[in-house]
Amino acid sequence: MSGEIERSQEVAVIFAQDTDHKAQYEALAKLCNKYLPQNAMGRVDTAEIIKIIDTVIALETGSMVVSRQFVSLITERLDNQHLESECVKAISEGILAIIKTRTISYEDQVCILRLMLASLYEKEGRIKDAAQALIAINSDTSPKFNGPQAAKEGAKAQLCIRITKLLLDCSEIDEAEQYVNRTSILMVDLGANPDIQIEHKALQARVSDAKRRFVEAAQRYYELSATEQLPNSDKLTALGKAIVCVLLAKPGPQRSRLLTLIFKDERAPKCASFELIAKMYLTKVIHKDELEEFEHQLQDHQKADEHGESILKGVIQEHNITAISQLYINISFKTLGQLLGVDTEAAESMAGEMISSERLHGYIDQTNGILHFEDSNPMRVWDSQILSTLEQINKVSDMIVARHSEFAEFLT
């Protein structure tokens, strides 16, 4: 306690002895040298430094010119790789706590301290704390993120990108989406900056993937795989992720279009899951043992939906029903269940849901427990209807000839 009083008195004397801001700052800088010299190494007395800063800010009234300069000096000296990170962290957190209610007067210093803390937290694996440190920066008013040079470098967009990455890494997906959307707005003013654009596209894909919007994610990953600036290895990685997402996506026109694009892409056979893409595109039955390797590639959010149901299992079962419809005119639900690896009731429920949503053409004979398939190809349906009509005409003609033999001469 006596040390704190002594330090407070020392700072008070500096302010009392001279009213000149320059002289006050120089005297405080000398005091700072005792506890936090330039190029300091190892540990420093964090408690003393924080007390000095607290006293300086508390005693100075009016313009706060000296206290701002002094906090800037401390901030500069904290940016020193030879200082123990725990000391840097403690002093930075201490300063932020002291000026919490006066942040607007120390915006530049606060910004630098938060950036410093974010890097330290990230190294320690405190990903969420790192994200929160960056989120607390007011990039709209902070000098570091405004002005011609900051605009040219896309400083605000880069900050949002960094925040998005951290939020994704700590599974704060909804908040990550907010920042990826904010980056999209900033990109309009930023113009063509290929590096930032690529990072942004990759994060858009990751957010869509994490939100289980797999068709959208597949589309973004595929676009990324065609980006000229990326090395071939990164292009293939993006293509592989597009394949994973399209395999997990629900059926629909956009998914069908992506399946076609990927299947016909000459790079696709180099990807691990190409055989599954081929079977899905060609509407062939996919067996359980063919999925083992693919399942190992899946991330946690790709394995189950929000209800805990397997995403892959549902998609593959639906695909297999469609594939079976190409092989059978009709099938019992018992046999269908055996082919799908589910019980009879589940097979009937799946088929019924697909028919009701027009993802499968057919009808259910509940009395006999049979699923009847109808051809969804309009030309084949048209041909079938013509053939059926002609067969009926022939049948009627034969019946007429059987009763009235003279009609045969008319037909010939």
From Swiss-Prot:
Keywords, in A-Z order: Cytoplasm, Developmental protein, Differentiation, Nucleus, Oogenesis, Signalosome
Subcellular locations according to the entry: Cytoplasm; Nucleus
SUPFAM superfamilies, sorted: Winged helix' DNA-binding domain
Domain of life of the native organism: Eukaryota
GO terms classed as biological process: cell cycle switching; oogenesis; regulation of oogenesis
UniProt cross-references to PANTHER family, sorted A to Z: 26S PROTEASOME NON-ATPASE REGULATORY SUBUNIT 12/COP9 SIGNALOSOME COMPLEX SUBUNIT 4, COP9 SIGNALOSOME COMPLEX SUBUNIT 4
Protein's UniProt name: COP9 signalosome complex subunit 4
Record organism: Caenorhabditis elegans
